Amino acid sequence: MEESSLSRAPSRGGVNFLNVARTYIPNTKVECHYTLPPGTMPSASDWIGIFKVEAACVRDYHTFVWSSVPESTTDGSPTHASVQFQASYLPKPGAQLYQFRYVNRQGRVCGQSPPFQFREPRPMDELVTLEEADGGSDILLVVPKATVLQNQLDESQQERNDLMQLKLQLEDQVTELRSRVQELEAALATARQEHSELTEQYKGLSRSHGELSEERDILSQQQGDHVARILELEDDIQTMSDKVLMKEVELDRVRDTVKALTREQEKLLRQLKEFQADKEQSEAELQTVREENCCLNTELEEAKSRQEEQGAQVQRLKDKLAHMKDTLGQAQQKVAELEPLKEQLRGVQELAASSQQKAALLGEELASAAGARDRTIAELHRSRLEVAEVNGRLAELSLHMKEEKCQWSKERTGLLQSMEAEKDKILKLSAEILRLEKTVQEERTQSHVFKTELAREKDSSLVQLSESKRELTELRSALRVLQKEKEQLQTEKQELLEYMRKLEARLEKVADEKWTEDAATEDEEATAGLSCPASLTDSEDESPEDMRLPSYGLCESGNTSSSPPGPREPSSLVVINQPAPIAPQFSGPGEASSSDSEAEDEKSVLMAAVQSGGEEASLLLPELGSAFYDVASAFTVSSLSEASPGVPANPPWKECPICKERFPAESDKDALEGHMDGHFFFSTQDPFTFE
């Protein structure tokens, strides 16, 4: 640590010290609580020291401890921490003012506490005056501060336990709500998954429906194409059929023509054959005629010889030759007539050949037309089969599509209904989730508020606990001091009791002597009137302090070996304030009234001392003398006997003059003294054991 002048840390944004007491008890641990502002990075090199108020340098510390490094916080809230100063390093008690100071590793003071002192506790500082809640009485209760603090600590602990139970209940509720939210989220995820699956199925069915629609459109288009092709083929077939019919008609006509030509050819051939046969016959006849002519020529030559002989025969032959010539002319004419017939036959043959060729061509064309027709018929049949197959498939697809469409409609309706149900369910779940999130947010807010309040209560409880520990330590120290003082007072009381017994014996002796003198001078007093009681009362009023004992204060309590002062000299004037417990009273009415008034005065002084506090009462013990002893021992019954002369001197009970509590007449003296001591002294037992 480097030496530097102290700079006053600002109260805003610096380290704040919590619940710093004005005084601390030495020889006990001192716990220092502080909070670090948000954003402060604590270090192990930071330290907290106890400085004098006037200290101007960080090296002028009395003692210091290293600061504790708390766990890192991420919520931006201040960090609470605490350190302890050991009792052996604390300053000595005195009037010097000290303060806590937080010094960082750079040697800069980041915060300082209000000033405080180290001093021993005083007994009267640990008493607390409480007023009763009900207004029925004006009694002030003087109780130990430790009892009040213990009650407050018990209440704080009970409140902390209630808050912890409430926190546990809220955490259980939050856990249940979280589990319910998780279940709802799981159900929502399942519903969303089912919805996504149904959506996928719906999309798949939509795609299938689209594909089926496209396939149906394609098949419809193909069917239209096929129907158009079929119609076209039917038109072609009809055209071909018409052409074939025309060709067949033409072929039949050609066949008829060919048949007619064939018949005509055959007729012509028969005629030609007949003509040829006739020609051959004519040629044969001509040849025969030629041969005959040759023969005739020969014969003519022979006949020339015989011409004459056969003139007539020649003439005949000439006639026959002429006739033959005419026949030959006719035959030649017929042959000439047969030439156009040959030409016509040749033309008919050529026409028949061309007709045959045309018939062959027509046969070939008819065969090709028949083949085309067969092919067309086969293609038509195949097309019809394909169309029938396509129609069957289309019908099947239409039926399947209708079934799929019905099923799809049903599934779509079911899906729409389920989607509506899922939507309603999702809306309900969303509303439930929103409500649960709102409830969880409220619960979180309330839990955060409870946590904050619990942390605050915890901090305050820790501070109160530390304060209670400190006060408990102070109370224990004070109780030890009070116990010592009580022991000293008990010793002094025993000494006072011994001294009072001696004084009582002396007073009895003096009273006996005085009563003897009073009995001797009774006649003189009767003649002199009431002057003697008046003078006696005046003497009592003039010197009441002669009956007082020397004062024993708390300042002399340390000298436990000192003995009480000895009895006064017999020659000193002694005034009896309360002679009733010493011997029977035989004095007159004036003395009784004087003794009663003085007893009432002493009783009022005693009650005032009791109400003002135990210390004053203890200080008045020596001054009250035998009267206080008689009251404390519960043997004073003179007031009762004087108040009611007709009642017996010994009542059936013993009464405490402070709290008016009655005890049996056979009660022990020590018990009554202990009861009286309870009004002025604390118990030596610890009020509670703090763990």
Swiss-Prot record:
Pfam families: CALCOCO1, SKICH, Zn-C2H2_12. Belongs to the CALCOCO family. Changing residue 20 to P: Reduced binding to p300 KIX domain; severe reduction in the autonomous transactivation function. It comes from Mus musculus. Residues 512-605 are annotated as: Disordered. Keywords: Activator, Coiled coil, Cytoplasm, Metal-binding, Nucleus, Phosphoprotein, Transcription, Transcription regulation, Wnt signaling pathway, Zinc, Zinc-finger. This is Calcium-binding and coiled-coil domain-containing protein 1. Part of a calphoglin complex consisting of CALCOCO1, PPA1 and PGM. Interacts with the bHLH-PAS domains of GRIP1, AHR and ARNT. Interacts with CTNNB1 via both its N- and C-terminal regions. Interacts with EP300. Interacts with CCAR1 (via N-terminus) and GATA1. Functions as a coactivator for aryl hydrocarbon and nuclear receptors (NR). Recruited to promoters through its contact with the N-terminal basic helix-loop-helix-Per-Arnt-Sim (PAS) domain of transcription factors or coactivators, such as NCOA2. During ER-activation acts synergistically in combination with other NCOA2-binding proteins, such as EP300, CREBBP and CARM1. Involved in the transcriptional activation of target genes in the Wnt/CTNNB1 pathway. Functions as a secondary coactivator in LEF1-mediated transcriptional activation via its interaction with CTNNB1.
